[in-house]
Amino acid sequence: MTTPIDETQVFPPAREAEIAALMVDAVDLHCHSGPAAMPRILDHLEATLDAEAAGFSALVFKDHYYLGSNHCAMMEKLMPDLKVRLFSGIALNNACGGINPHAVDHAIRLDGKIVWMPTLAAKNHIDQSAKATKNFPSASKPMLKAIPLTVLDANGALTDETKQVLDLIAEGDIILAGGHLHVSEQVKLFEEAIARGVRKMLVNHPTYVIECSDEDIRSFASMGVHMEHSICMFVDGRGYKWGGDRLAELIGLAGIDRTVLSSDLGLTGSPRPVEGFRRVLNTLLDQQFTHAQIRTMISTNGLHLLNLA
């Protein structure tokens, strides 16, 4: 019988113990807790307490419209005994002025750890949203129509603002994430990022919205870019897309050392982030990944990207 998505899935005792041990020191680089403009099933405090109880090392709050670093600072001050480290970043959508170097500079000064290129306001995302096959989460109340954003100018070259953002990311030694830009944009983005000294790079859900081919994934990994696969797409719930066999294939394309698994959870109709981790760990164990391989993908790689290891 399938476990309801809002409940904790129960595994045999030996598997439960195995999963619990693997969860210790996990890192979630993509937690969609609230408050948010779109409905969320838990808030930042609840996500923090869940992660703390499971023994996570770090949690990164992602919102499409605001930098969450102030929430992190206040929660850490109010709960000084927390072991899980709390971080956030900024998504360069219309709410922060788009591809805005001033917003990025501010985010870095507030200890932001990730700069996501445009997500919901990316031209690619808007184009994909027009397709009947897509079912993106929407805001609880109508918002202003998004102004489509791209990192490329009319001649197909990176814009000056994008280059300035890359320089700031390199100087801050934080993570550049491709957001919802199309793969064709991300190729140029990461090539320029490397040339400008960016060392930590991430492609978010490469096979969803981004339209990466298997060869694109191999190519990005060879450049030193990590592939971040969204757990929500491999566990039961609203975001489910593929089973364990496909996840194993995708991991094989980039390799263990260039793969990160993050929840991308908090959306309605799906498990909570920590529960998503539990379920995907069960899948990885069923796929015969070793404990060392799993820890690399859910902990070690994320700690390195956050400069915690």
Segments predicted by a language model, with ranges:
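Extended substrate/RNA-proximal surfaces in nucleic-acid metabolism proteins
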Residues: 83, 94-203
